[in-house]
Amino acid sequence: MKKKVLAIALVTAFTGMGVAQAADVTAQAVATWSATAKKDTTSKLVVTPLGSLAFQYAEGIKGFNSQKGLFDVAIEGDATATAFKLTSRLITNTLTQLDTSGSTLSVGVDYNGAAVEKTADTVMIDTANGVLGGNLSALANGYNASGRTTAQDGFTFSIISGTTNGTTAVTDYSTLPEGIWSGDVSVQFDATWTS
């Protein structure tokens, strides 16, 4: 009996030692969505982003993911119009790190393989020259009809450059400081109804 008690005590002691040496490891991450609400059904041109952008650094590729950013375009028809043109132009695209480093990232915007630049308009629809807008073709067909016409399409967004401190460019994103960058990517849309 004493041997059984001693054996049970030894097994319990070894089991207790194993538990005492093990430590729980936990990790936590937070996902954040931007949230605003707006309704505009009376302006001649309304462009609504259908989501927000979140770029994540991937160690395996030493870079950031790219994202498709969808948008909805609504226009008011003009029965006197004989042609319609829709263009886009990049306004802002800098994300700044939320610490004291001053590190920045520049976001590139592409529409159907063409870069949307700050210095020139990107033609999305130009009915006079046969550019009918791909996924936005409903606008090319409805610009001179009464009422409103809507269509959806998307830009491809990607991180195209970065700095460690606001001035020193990086060629290897793995050298960027750790942290979170924040900012706005704004694209201006211009619509022209020609009568």
From Swiss-Prot:
Gene Ontology cellular component list: pilus
User: What is the name listed in the Swiss-Prot or TrEMBL entry for this protein?
Assistant: Common pilus major fimbrillin subunit EcpA
Coiled-coil zones:
none
Q: Where in the cell is it found?
A: Fimbrium
Name the source's superkingdom: Bacteria
- Species of origin reads Klebsiella pneumoniae (strain 342)
Q: What does this protein do?
A: Part of the ecpRABCDE operon, which encodes the E.coli common pilus (ECP). ECP plays a dual role in early-stage biofilm development and host cell recognition. Major subunit of the fimbria.
UniProt keyword terms in alphabetical order? Fimbrium, Signal
